[in-house]
Amino acid sequence: MAALKKVLIAATVAAIAAFFGHAFLKINRLSLASREMPVKHLKCHYLPNIEYGAEDITVLKDGLAFLSTGLHDYLDMPSFSNEPGKMYVLDLLHPKPTPVELQIKGELDLNSFNPHGISVYTDEADDSIYLFVVNHPQRKSQVEIFRFVWDDTLVHLKTVAHPLLHSVNDIVAVGPEHFYATNDRYFHNAAPQVLTVVLSLPWCNVVYYSPEEVREAAGGIQSANGINISPDKRYIYVSDVLDHEVDVFERLDGEQLVYVKSVAVGRLCQNIEVDHVTGDVWLGCHPDATKLSKFDPEEPPGSEIIKIKSIISDQPVVTLEYGDDGHELMGSTVAVPYEGKLLIGTLFHKALYCSLK
């Protein structure tokens, strides 16, 4: 009996060791650990006033860009300021574009404002501009809806919170109070969440919200991150960061999403922006996620910006547009093209204004 007990203990220890060994290798593979960093620089300079990241950026057709800054205390990612987050606006048609802080009016606790993904919606009926902002006060997830009042004011209209919106990363607005949002994890506790990653459980999703209904619009995603919409409003794009893919869904009547395809990108990509003119898809990506989680200023996390041309076609083309080993820009999360210019935002570092010509 004692001998059998020893065998069982030894077998259990061996099984646990094997599982943790598998988990370590799996996480390293998903994180693209030790991946060779491609370098491709552009003519760029840092945007003034942006010192602690611009996690998401989006731009209107007239060149007015909105920036979400100061994300902190989120998923144990590095951050270097505990100050409340801020929103900025930037006129890309100005000869020297400079971010201007937006003044926020209304009943919103600015002391706990922690902005993440953003989206903008223009109501064609009266040209009103609505800004949707994912907010994480005290590590919660909610969506703030603002009306933009020229030229530097946001009027807070509404806070949206719902059990289905439990871990919102990004958002794409499709109406004045209507949006799709990604949940980037299933569990809030670290241990079970790591288990879902190790076991490749695709339990993340996209949620559709309107004042009339809230429901899952798409599931089966391992780690839903950035989300955006095609210029013709027909397709929704979702970045599955751990699968190193961009998932394409067709948007049908009744706000139903039907999976179409996935495009491999070979990187850990976050936010998605779409060129208003060409329809090209731009993504801010991480070359090696282990350098984010184990931040070392001597070996900083790099940045990669990629573009996908003809994403709906049978032969989409993925190209590297910018690459840096972290000594110019750390932890890129978003890239926004506009008439030969490019804005690049980051998780916690600075933001770049670049020329594509």
Predicted segments, located by residue:
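Loop/turn-rich, solvent-exposed surfaces of beta-rich toroidal or solenoidal domains
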Residues: 230, 245, 265-322
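Beta-propeller blade signature
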Residues: 82-94, 141-150, 197-211, 299-312
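Short, conserved, GDST-rich strand-edge loop motifs in beta-rich repeat architectures
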Residues: 67-84, 133-136, 181-201, 283-302
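A short helix->beta-strand "capping" segment at the edge of beta-propeller domains
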Residues: 27-52, 97-104, 153-154, 315-326
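Blade/loop signatures of beta-propeller domains
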Residues: 15-42, 90-92, 191, 199-200, ...
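Blade-level signature of beta-propeller repeat domains, shared across WD40, Kelch, NHL, RCC1
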Residues: 329-357
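Blade-loop segments of beta-propeller domains
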Residues: 49, 53-56, 71-124, 131, ...
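Beta-rich, blade/repeat-based domains predominating
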Residues: 50-61, 106-124, 156, 162-179, ...
